[in-house]
Amino acid sequence: MIKKDRFTNEKLNKLFDSPFSLVNYAIKQAKIKIAKGDVRSSNVAIETLVLLDREGIQPEFTEEIVVTASPTVERKRSEHTNSRKKDPSAYTWSDVK
């Protein structure tokens, strides 16, 4: 990768929804290399950036992360939030720092 063609945060933000998506993509690429027996390099992160530069994003390896909470956690959350609600009228702007 030539110095002027290096990935910047702006370029990576266009390619991936979040840093976690980039990390997950790199992990999947590393697993594929290990499965193929191609572990010559010690820095898979740099190799993944080179791969992105050369081949672009391979859609079959991108993933959508959906965060879900179990019903038990949601129930506990709702129980705690009801008992901990504070009256916003009790505060003034002078209390906010």
Curated annotation (Swiss-Prot):
The lineage of its organism: Bacteria, Pseudomonadati, Chlamydiota, Chlamydiia, Chlamydiales. This is Uncharacterized protein CPn_0121/CP_0652/CPj0121/CpB0122. Belongs to the chlamydial CPn_0121/CT_031/TC_0300 family. Residues 73-88 have a biased composition (Basic and acidic residues). Residues 72-97 are annotated as: Disordered.
